[in-house]
Amino acid sequence: MTPDLQKAGAAILERHQQATVAASAGGASFGRTLLGDEPDFEHGVALYLEEISVSFDGFKALNSLSLAIDVGEMRCIIGPNGAGKTTMMDVITGKTRPDSGRAHFGSNIDLLRLREPQIVRAGICRKFQKPTVYEELSVFENLELALQNDRGVRAALFARMSGPQRERIAEILQLVHLLPEAYRIAGLLSHGQKQWLEIGMLLAQEPRLLLLDEPVAGMTDEETERTAELFLTLVGKHSLVVVEHDMKFVDMLTQGHRKVTVLHEGSVLAEGTLAEVQSNTQVIDVYLGR
């Protein structure tokens, strides 16, 4: 385990030990600390995975995977098919329970104790490769539903929106390049625009961590560039984990200095700048090719 992972793990362990002492002394309950709505980012770590292993019928999809994502960081995850990228995100979002290991959001939320809806409420949102929007509704209505996600579809559409809510939707529309398309039916948007709309719907939920699975798959070159611009504006306010195969897009996001993680056979094969991992002989052999 690398020194930065050891440091992150030590901080989280210390936080949990403090909570245990408080609970035994009659203070705040340990369960409440782990399941609280607000993640504690005091130590600067947004997401911490330690020795996560997952097996399916004898196949190890994740093999003692350890990873730490800092608050406000954008991390690109690359690797060959079957490397464990999707399973990793399934564990983070509660879709898959690991055989062993630890997964924490901030220093106080144990993700392995939460169900999928609780993880979303804690501030983790996931975007799949294929966009999922309400195609029969307008772009604005899609964002309205996302903003009022505690209501049903019908109730949300007929509820009166406040001024701040309308302003928030306008901000998101501007951010995701869809302001001119606000009242267009979502089903008429291009593939890239649907991707932007879904990202906007996630942003309406005010996530602290965004998990993005091949977000530019099927996009034009222009849409890919504008998506990179969008993600770069989110850095700092949100933490982002971007799973991607498009090395040109990864280069746009990392800008020569952000860290890239390479997965292989369920564990971390290499980490560093894009240039560093591209020159790594192991990465070349198993993923990039010679």
Language-model segment annotations:
Residues 31, 36-40, 156-181, 229-232:
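Conserved ABC ATPase "signature" region
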Residues 93:
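Helix-to-loop junction immediately C-terminal to a conserved catalytic motif
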Residues 1-53:
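ABC-family P-loop ATPase nucleotide-binding domain
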Residues 102-122, 161:
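ABC ATPase NBD Q-loop/coupling interface
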Residues 210-214:
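Catalytic Walker B motif of ABC-type/P-loop ATPase nucleotide-binding domains
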Residues 112-113, 172-188, 193:
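Conserved ABC nucleotide-binding domain
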Residues 78-80:
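The feature captures the beta-strand-to-loop junction immediately N-terminal to the Walker
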